[in-house]
C-alpha cells in the first residue's frame, strides 16, 4: 500500500470513528430520555433504562450510517483543506478522482463489514430489547409467530387462553385454521375448526365453524370470537424486520411464502441491506463533490450545513420511495433502486471537472 493511500485510509477512518461515536452518544441520550419517560410510572432498577437504551441504540445507528458517511467525508476533506494537503496531493500528481477511487473501495469494504457484522449484532440486540420491554407492555399477554407449520397465535381474552394455528393468511382472512380454547387452568373448553376466518376486526367471524366440545360436534355457519388480534395488529407484529438478522430474514421469507403472507416488507429489508454498501459510496461521492465545490468557502460551518440540508432532502426522497414500496404502489426493486439512480445521476453531473478543483 502506497504512503498516500495509507494516509488517506487512516485519516478517513479517524473521521468516521469520531462521527460514529458522536452519533452513538446522541442517539443513546435520546433513547434514554424515551425509556425514562416510558418507565416513569413503573418501579424498575435505575440501570434498567440505561441498559435498554444501550442495546436499542445500535439499530438506530445502523439506519443513520449513510449520513455518518456523509458527515465523515465532510470532516475528512475539511482536514485536508485545513493543512493544504489536497493541494500537496494535486502537485504530486494525485488526482481528485484517484482519491475518490481509493476511498470508495475502502467504504465498500467497510459497508460490507457493517452489513455483515454490525447489522447482525444490532438485530440481535434489538430482538433482546423487544423481548425485555414486552414484559412491561400490554402485549405480553399474546404472541404470534410464523413457522414452517403456518401462523401460530397465543391469546388471552377474558381469562380464556386461545391457541390458534392457521396454514395460510390472505386478504384479512385466516385459512385452514384450528383453534383450541382453554380456561385459566388449561382445561380444554372447546376446539374450533374452520376453512376461513374473517379477522378484519378483533371480533373474528368464523365461517362454517366446526365446534368440538368433549365428544360432541356442532357446525355453525357464522361464529363470532372476541380476541386481542385483528388483521392490522398481526401485520404490525411482523413488520419490525430490524430485529431479524440477515439469515433470519431469509428463513422468515421462506415461512412467509408458505403462509401466503406478503413478502413486500421482508424483501424491502433484504434488498436494502444488499444495496447499503453502494448507498454508502454514493453518499461519500456526493459529500466529497460538495466539499470540493465549496473549497473556497472560508466558513467551515456553512459547508457542513449545506451537506446536512442536502442529506435531509436525500433522506426524504429515500423515505418517499420506501413508503411507495411498502404500500406496493411500486415494486420492491424500484423503491430501493430509484433513489440510488437519482443520487448516481446527480453525482455524475456534478463530478465533471472535479480534478480542476
Where are these regions (language model features)?
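An acidic-aromatic
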Residues: 210-220, 328
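General N-terminal targeting signals
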Residues: 183, 196, 216, 221-223, ...
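Short, surface-exposed secondary-structure junctions/capping segments
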Residues: 205-213, 236-243
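Structural signature for solvent-exposed beta-strand/loop edge elements and short helix-capping sites
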Residues: 153-200, 205-209
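Mature-chain termini and adjacent capping regions
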Residues: 210, 221-224, 245-247
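Transmembrane alpha-helices
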Residues: 1-156, 231-357
Amino acid at each position: 500500500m502506497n504512503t498516500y493511500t495509507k494516509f488517506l485510509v487512516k485519516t478517513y477512518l479517524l473521521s468516521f470513528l469520531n462521527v460514529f461515536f458522536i452519533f452513538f452518544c446522541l442517539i443513546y441520550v435520546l433513547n434514554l430520555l424515551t425509556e425514562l419517560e416510558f418507565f416513569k410510572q413503573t418501579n424498575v432498577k435505575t440501570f434498567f433504562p440505561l441498559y435498554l437504551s444501550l442495546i436499542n441504540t445500535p439499530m438506530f445507528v445502523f439506519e443513520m450510517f449513510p449520513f455518518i458517511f456523509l458527515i465523515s467525508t465532510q470532516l475528512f476533506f475539511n482536514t485536508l483543506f485545513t493543512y493544504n494537503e489536497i493541494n500537496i496531493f494535486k502537485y504530486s500528481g494525485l488526482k481528485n478522482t484517484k482519491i475518490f477511487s481509493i476511498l470508495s473501495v475502502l467504504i465498500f469494504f467497510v459497508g460490507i463489514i457493517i452489513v455483515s457484522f454490525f447489522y447482525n449484532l444490532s438485530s440481535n440486540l434489538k430482538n433482546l430489547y423487544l423481548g425485555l420491554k414486552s414484559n412491561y407492555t400490554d402485549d405480553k399477554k399474546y404472541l404470534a409467530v410464523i413457522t414452517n407449520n403456518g401462523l401460530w397465535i397465543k391469546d388471552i381474552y377474558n381469562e380464556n387462553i386461545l391457541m390458534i394455528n392457521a396454514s395460510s393468511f390472505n386478504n384479512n382472512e385466516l385459512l385452514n385454521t384450528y383453534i383450541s380454547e382453554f380456561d385459566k387452568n388449561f382445561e380444554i373448553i372447546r376446539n374450533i375448526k374452520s376453512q376461513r376466518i374473517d379477522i378484519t376486526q378483533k371480533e373474528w367471524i368464523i365461517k362454517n365453524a366446526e365446534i368440538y366440545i368433549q365428544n360432541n360436534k356442532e357446525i355453525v355457519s357464522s361464529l363470532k370470537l372476541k380476541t386481542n388480534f385483528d388483521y392490522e395488529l398481526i401485520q404490525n407484529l411482523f413488520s419490525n424486520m430490524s430485529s431479524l438478522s440477515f439469515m433470519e430474514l431469509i428463513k422468515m421469507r421462506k415461512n412467509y411464502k408458505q403462509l401466503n403472507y406478503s413478502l413486500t416488507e421482508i424483501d424491502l429489508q433484504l434488498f436494502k441491506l444488499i444495496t447499503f454498501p453502494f448507498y454508502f459510496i454514493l453518499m461519500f461521492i456526493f459529500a466529497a463533490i460538495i466539499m470540493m465545490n465549496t473549497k473556497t468557502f472560508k466558513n467551515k460551518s456553512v459547508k457542513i450545513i449545506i451537506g446536512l440540508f442536502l442529506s435531509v432532502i436525500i433522506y426524504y426522497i429515500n423515505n418517499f420511495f420506501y413508503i411507495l414500496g411498502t404500500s406496493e404502489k411500486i415494486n420492491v426493486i424500484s423503491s430501493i433502486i430509484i433513489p440510488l439512480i437519482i443520487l448516481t445521476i446527480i453525482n455524475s453531473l456534478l463530478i465533471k471537472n472535479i480534478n480542476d478543483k
